[in-house]
Each structure stands twice: as structure tokens, then as C-alpha cells.
From Swiss-Prot:
A Pfam family hit: WAP
WAP domain sequence ranges: 27-74
Secretion signal, residue range per the UniProt entry: 1-23
Biological-process GO terms, alphabetical: antibacterial humoral response; innate immune response
Record localization: Secreted
Protein name: WAP four-disulfide core domain protein 12
Gene3D superfamilies in the record: Elafin-like (4.10.75.10)
Reported function: Antibacterial protein. Putative acid-stable proteinase inhibitor.
Keyword line: Antibiotic, Antimicrobial, Disulfide bond, Protease inhibitor, Secreted, Serine protease inhibitor, Signal
GO molecular function terms attached to this record: serine-type endopeptidase inhibitor activity
GO cellular component, one term: extracellular space
Gene (UniProt): WFDC12
Domain of life: Eukaryota
InterPro entries, per the entry: Elafin-like_sf, WAP_dom, WAP_four-disulfide_core
Amino acid sequence: MGSSSFLVLMVSLALVTLVAVEGVKEGIEKAGVCPADNVRCFKSDPPQCHTDQDCLGERKCCYLHCGFKCVIPVKELEEGGNKDEDVSRP
């Protein structure tokens, strides 16, 4: 195997590894649930986060008050909330 073939193989392996690790990292969801959000919005704000991993510490990426933001989660869903609200993530 020539040195150029070896280099192409090593670069390909490195890229596959990086993509695989990034995919695993994004799938991790932090503990707790998003607070109930009963605010009606005419227009959504730009997202401040996309996944829980974008948020520092224990904060989760939740749709709250017209946009995705990093917020402190609640242990249980508050009365009047909808546990399925979390499925609207982009």
C-alpha cells in the first residue's frame, strides 16, 4: 500500500469516528422534563439551543415562551402541561 493510499485510509477512518461520536453525543438527553409552556405565540424566536448538549450544567433545551432555550428542568410535568410537547424539536 502506497503512502497516499494509507493517508486516504487514515483520514477516512478519522472522519467516520468523528461522525459516529458526534451522533452518540447528540442522542444524550438530560434528566428532568421541560416546564409546561402555555404561551401562544404568533412568531417563534430564533433558537438559543438545538439539543440538551448545547446547554450548560443541568439545563435542558426546551421550547418555552416562543422559542427553544436552555432552562432548568422540572422533576415532573406540571399540571396542565403536555408530556408530548418535547416532540416538536427541530
